[in-house]
């Protein structure tokens, strides 16, 4: 394991403790095992995109809160792999009412990536550059070809997969309203 896992684990533990949430309660809320969450906090488990989004959603924070120190440049972020998607954080934009995270996505064919609900009010905006993507709410995904854009409320379970045998490339803009 490199320092990235330890850094993510430390930030995760600080956030959980600051909110007064037990390890068991957060694991239950995120839909992951207590041992998995404990391993993340200790920096002994390699976090996947699915797990990080599940925990971030349960805590009501953007993904960047877990993967970047406050004030750090997105250039310091690394690729975060998931079942089908590898995401790279390109930029974070802060406004008084929301945080915007811009990610580059590579989606491998033949696999469906399931993403847990984000915090209430989170929206995702995806633009496809190569390949064809099926993404959006798990019960009604949308399809986009190169040059097309799709958006959806991401506070419900959602999915990402390719249509056809080719890898897809896209950018994803996630808008997370500030939690009061």
Where are the regions a protein language model picked out?
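Short basic helix-loop element that most often maps to the first helix and adjoining turn
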Residues: 10-27
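Recognition helix of helix-turn-helix/homeodomain-like DNA-binding domains
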Residues: 32-45
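A short, N-terminal "cap"/entry segment at the start of jelly-roll beta-barrel domains
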Residues: 49-99
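A short glycine-rich, His/Asp/Glu-containing loop-to-beta-strand
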Residues: 80-117, 123, 172-178
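Short acidic-glycine-tyrosine-enriched beta hairpin
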Residues: 138-155
């Amino acid at each position: 394991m490199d320092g990235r896992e330890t850094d993510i684990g430390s930030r995760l533990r600080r956030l959980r403790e600051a909110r007064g949430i037990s390890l068991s309660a957060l694991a239950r809320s995120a839909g992951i095992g207590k041992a998995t969450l404990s391993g993340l906090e200790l920096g002994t488990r390699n976090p996947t995109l699915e797990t990080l989004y599940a925990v971030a959603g349960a805590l009501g924070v953007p993904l960047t809160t877990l993967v970047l120190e406050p004030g750090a440049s997105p250039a310091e972020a690394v690729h975060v792999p998931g079942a089908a998607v590898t995401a790279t954080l390109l930029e974070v934009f802060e406004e008084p009412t929301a945080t915007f995270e811009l990610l580059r996505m590579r989606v491998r064919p033949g696999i469906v990536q399931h993403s847990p609900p984000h915090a209430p009010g989170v929206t995702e905006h995806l633009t496809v550059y190569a390949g064809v993507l099926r993404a959006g709410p798990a019960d009604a995904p949308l399809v986009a070809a190169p040059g097309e854009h799709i958006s959806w409320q991401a506070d419900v379970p959602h999915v990402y997969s390719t249509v056809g045998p080719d890898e897809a490339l896209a950018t994803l803009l996630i808008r997370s309203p500030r939690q009061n």
